[in-house]
């Protein structure tokens, strides 16, 4: 036995990791994620969930939040915070039909505090500001159109991402089908979701209800992608498990498997760090689900259940050794990884505007700043997408860059859809390449973890960066992958950017430099806890040097490493804090 839990302590490969965290007790006692959520739903004295249920609703795809802009004012009035939930839908590969879109648009308008739909870096949508009386209605509305939110949060395999490449339609379809298969294979088998939210029949549970995840589920969240090179829009190195598509003559034949990526860290704790995924090797298609289960169960058994800050797969690999972890996966899957097939990641951005696929269909990628679909003054974006949904015969594809593709448009419908997009501010040639390559997480006012602004901070900050680029004579193609995240948990994927800002306190950020265009290098902290004004001053100096000293076609991140402005992070555990 390579692992055991005795006397509330965990031992892995002979090493005692310590006393189990309280989250392990919570999961053990939850009766396969049921807890007392149903009783909490009936309690209208508070708008929130209590005790363990605050954590358990995450496994059902929700986070309890409140509006931090009005928290102090409510406290003065002796009111509790305005508790509500954010829901993240399970949409493997990010494909949604026009009919589904119209239903979620209607729900967001009628039953959420903010009236918006938020496209996220997890290639799905989020509802923000749903009050307790509307939560069950929300789940039942989604269920009526074939959508759920099982396992989009919590210690489980989250929403499976898939490269959105509308040009390679046949290959994309194959990859998308695998994303769906992997999602279903790794999904919790508990009936708790249906019982609580869909008024399903109560069933007796047994120990083997969760053959892959186990009764206590995973030590920490787990993220999976299917990616088609050379496009790395899903950012493989932000994820625990990645299947890199290998094709011959346009047909998918297998995957290279990358394990152990992740970006979250904790300020001041050098045992936490962002980390690239390791390449385990190549597998044929028929072994995909076996390998997925083997990686997940190895992490289930070997991941740290004592310290949640060190519980993710990336830390397990660094603790036990990549070769040891890989050998265990081979043993459990009954395979031997072959040598990785050649591939290269060259880009991550979405191709904004129209492209034609090899199937003759047209695809329109709409740039949605920060993924926030809302009707702004003079730019009714949310209404615009709804109007397109009313006449669109194809589907929509949400991207991991928080944009939206109107996919599968016939030649006869193209002009009508473009007209609607332009009328509602969804197409704008004035959007710079810099803005298209900038991204932020939600942060304030809804995220309880946010230490600084991100989504609300980004638009003006990008305008300021555009001014700096222009000042130094750089043209529109000379842009920088720029990302802002309001805390070190990494939702905005700043730790794979050329310039990454990580929130430290209101108005203050850590400035990281040295990532690259393809998303294959982790940036390193350049300045700590500085203000927006100081950040812009630093960027001004750095961009000035880049403009004058760069090699032909040298991107900003590569330049900062080459000239020694920042040291390259090769092995995160060794280099990130060095």
UniProtKB/Swiss-Prot annotation:
Its EC number is 1.8.1.2. Siroheme binds at residue 491. [4Fe-4S] cluster binds at residues 441, 447, 487, 491. Its cofactor is siroheme; [4Fe-4S] cluster. The keyword Nuclease does not apply. It comes from the Bacteria. GO terms for cellular component: sulfite reductase complex (NADPH). Binds 1 siroheme per subunit. The keyword 4Fe-4S applies. InterPro entries: CysI, NiRdtase/SiRdtase_haem-b_fer, Nit/Sulf_reduc_fer-like_dom_sf, NO2/SO3_Rdtase_4Fe4S_dom, NO2/SO3_Rdtase_4Fe4S_prot, NO2/SO3_Rdtase_4Fe4S_sf, NO2/SO3_Rdtase_FeS/sirohaem_BS. Pathway: Sulfur metabolism; hydrogen sulfide biosynthesis; hydrogen sulfide from sulfite (NADPH route): step 1/1. GO terms for molecular function: 4 iron, 4 sulfur cluster binding; heme binding; metal ion binding; NADP binding; sulfite reductase (ferredoxin) activity; sulfite reductase (NADPH) activity. Disulfide bonds: none annotated. Keywords: 4Fe-4S, Amino-acid biosynthesis, Cysteine biosynthesis, Heme, Iron, Iron-sulfur, Metal-binding, NADP, Oxidoreductase. GO terms for biological process: cysteine biosynthetic process; hydrogen sulfide biosynthetic process; sulfate assimilation. Coiled coil: none annotated. Pfam families: NIR_SIR, NIR_SIR_ferr. It catalyses: hydrogen sulfide + 3 NADP(+) + 3 H2O = sulfite + 3 NADPH + 4 H(+). PROSITE patterns: NIR_SIR. Belongs to the nitrite and sulfite reductase 4Fe-4S domain family. Alpha(8)-beta(8). The alpha component is a flavoprotein, the beta component is a hemoprotein. Component of the sulfite reductase complex that catalyzes the 6-electron reduction of sulfite to sulfide. This is one of several activities required for the biosynthesis of L-cysteine from sulfate. This is Sulfite reductase [NADPH] hemoprotein beta-component.
């Amino acid at each position: 036995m390579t692992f055991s839990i005795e006397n509330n302590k965990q031992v892995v490969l002979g090493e005692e990791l310590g006393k189990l965290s309280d989250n392990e007790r919570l999961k053990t006692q939850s009766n396969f994620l049921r807890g007392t959520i149903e009783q909490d739903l009936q309690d209208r004295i508070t708008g929130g969930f209590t005790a363990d249920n605050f954590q358990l609703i995450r496994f059902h795809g929700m986070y309890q939040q409140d509006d931090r802009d009005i928290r102090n004012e409510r406290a003065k009035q002796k009111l509790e915070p305005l508790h509500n939930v954010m829901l993240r839908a399970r949409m493997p590969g990010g494909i949604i039909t026009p009919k589904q879109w119209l239903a979620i648009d209607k729900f967001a308008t009628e039953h959420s505090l903010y009236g918006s739909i938020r496209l996220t870096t997890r290639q799905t949508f989020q509802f923000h500001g749903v009050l307790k009386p509307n939560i069950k209605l929300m789940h039942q509305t989604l269920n009526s159109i074939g959508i759920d939110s099982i396992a989009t949060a919590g210690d489980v395999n989250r929403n499976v991402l898939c490269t959105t490449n509308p040009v390679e339609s046949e290959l994309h379809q194959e990859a998308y089908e695998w994303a769906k298969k992997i999602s279903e294979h790794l999904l919790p088998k508990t009936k708790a979701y249906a019982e609580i939210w869909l008024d399903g029949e109560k069933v007796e549970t047994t120990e083997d209800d969760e053959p892959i995840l186990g009764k206590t589920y995973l030590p920490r969240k787990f993220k999976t992608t299917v990616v088609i090179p050379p496009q790395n829009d899903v950012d493989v190195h932000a994820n625990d498990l990645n299947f890199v598509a290998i094709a011959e003559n346009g047909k998918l034949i297998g995957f290279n498997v990358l394990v152990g990526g992740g970006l979250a860290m904790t300020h001041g704790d050098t045992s936490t760090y962002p980390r690239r995924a390791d390449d385990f090797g190549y597998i044929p298609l028929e072994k995909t689900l076996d390998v997925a289960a083997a990686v997940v169960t190895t992490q289930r058994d070997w991941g740290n259940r004592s310290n949640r800050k060190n519980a993710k797969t990336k830390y397990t690999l660094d603790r036990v050794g990549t070769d040891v972890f890989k050998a265990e996966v081979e043993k459990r899957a009954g395979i031997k990884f072959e040598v990785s097939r050649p591939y290269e990641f060259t880009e991550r951005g979405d191709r904004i505007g129209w492209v034609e696929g090899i199937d003759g269909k047209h695809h329109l990628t709409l740039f949605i700043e920060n993924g926030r679909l809302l009707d702004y003054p003079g730019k009714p974006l949310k209404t615009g997408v709804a109007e397109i949904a009313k006449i669109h015969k194809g589907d929509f594809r949400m991207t991991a860059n928080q944009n939206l593709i109107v996919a599968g448009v016939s030649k006869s419908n193209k002009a009508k859809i473009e007209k609607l997009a332009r009328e509602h501010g969804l197409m704008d040639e004035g959007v710079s390449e810099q803005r298209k390559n900038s991204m932020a997480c939600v942060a304030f006012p809804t995220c309880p973890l946010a230490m600084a602004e991100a989504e609300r901070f980004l638009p003006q900050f990008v305008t300021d960066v555009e001014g700096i680029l222009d000042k130094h004579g750089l043209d529109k193609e000379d842009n920088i992958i720029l990302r802002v995240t309001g805390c070190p948990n990494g939702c905005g994927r700043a730790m794979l950017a050329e310039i990454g800002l990580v929130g430290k306190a209101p108005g203050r950020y850590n400035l990281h430099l040295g990532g690259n265009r393809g998303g294959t290098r982790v940036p390193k902290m350049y300045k700590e806890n500085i203000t927006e004004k100081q950040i812009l001053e630093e960027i001004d100096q750095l961009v000035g040097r880049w403009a004058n000293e760069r090699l032909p076609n040298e991107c900003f991140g590569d330049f900062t490493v080459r000239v020694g402005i920042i040291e390259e992070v090769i092995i995160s555990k060794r280099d990130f804090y060095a």
